[in-house]
């Protein structure tokens, strides 16, 4: 709904606004290990500390997260206010969070009272098959804030993003948004593309090329570095290799 969307200058501004609205200096944010490298300076600029949770083939290790939250409670440490993750075609790991873990993560957020910042940047760049429901779609509307952008879907210079959240949260973010506003020209152009179904059409055109690039990279790793453990993604831009 229109009242649940705040337009931003890309996803990074959305992440920054969320940090400024909810984090006090020195407070921790939960992130995956590894995580989106460009998000790290945003958290650092907001004086956040990090609680890193590992990943496996099914995405963020929710068992490890639950154990970490329990250990912090035993030590008398506060529950982190924010958890940041990219559940679809993770940057840089290429992983997708399983449906079972999405539900468990949502339940943990509700039980412990933290907010999930769901970065949906790569969600629409799917190579094949049906997508999983987003964390925000699984939520009751109170524990998930979604950030998105057209930069990865259409063009890097198209700095049009948005945050989807309940109106009360968006009011807090809008009060901090003092950049003069996202370019009306770019917003109008993005609106026209969206209204005409141009996103789906563009993604359908570029997916075969992205699949070709992925397959070439995977072949290269398997030929030149056969001992590497490779994540072969079903979407997005990233192949992750461990040696």
Task: Briefly describe each language-model feature range.
Residues 1, 201, 221-231:
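Surface-exposed helix-capping loop/turn segments at secondary-structure junctions
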Residues 1-112, 123-141:
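Conserved core of the PLP fold type I
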Residues 63, 103, 171, 187-188, ...:
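Feature representing long, continuous alpha-helical segments
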Residues 140-208:
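Conserved core segment of the aminotransferase class I/II
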Residues 208-218, 228-242:
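Conserved glycine-rich beta-strand-loop-beta hairpin in the small C-terminal domain of fold type I
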């Amino acid at each position: 709904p229109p009242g649940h969307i705040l337009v931003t200058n890309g996803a990074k501004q959305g992440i920054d606004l969320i940090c400024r609205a909810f984090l006090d200096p020195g407070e921790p944010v939960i992130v995956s290990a590894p995580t989106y490298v460009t998000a790290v300076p945003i958290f650092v600029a907001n004086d956040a500390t990090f609680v890193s949770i590992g990943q496996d083939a099914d995405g963020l290790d929710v068992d490890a997260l639950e154990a970490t939250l329990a250990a912090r409670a035993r030590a008398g440490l506060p529950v982190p206010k924010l958890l940041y993750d990219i559940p679809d075609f993770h940057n840089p790991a290429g992983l997708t969070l399983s449906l079972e873990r999405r539900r468990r993560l949502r339940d943990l957020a509700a039980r412990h009272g933290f907010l999930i910042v769901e970065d949906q940047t790569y969600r629409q760049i799917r190579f094949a098959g049906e997508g999983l429901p987003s964390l925000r779609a699984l939520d009751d509307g109170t524990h998930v804030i979604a950030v998105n952008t057209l930069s990865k879907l259409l063009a890097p210079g198209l700095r049009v993003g948005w945050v989807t959240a309940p109106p009360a949260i968006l009011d807090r973010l809008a009060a901090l948004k003092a950049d003069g506003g996202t370019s009306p020209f770019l917003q109008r152009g993005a609106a026209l593309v969206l209204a005409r179904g141009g996103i789906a059409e563009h993604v359908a055109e570029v997916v075969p090329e992205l699949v070709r690039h992925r397959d070439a990279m995977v072949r290269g790793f398997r030929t030149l570095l056969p001992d590497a453990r490779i994540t072969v993604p079903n979407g997005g831009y990233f192949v992750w290799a461990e040696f």
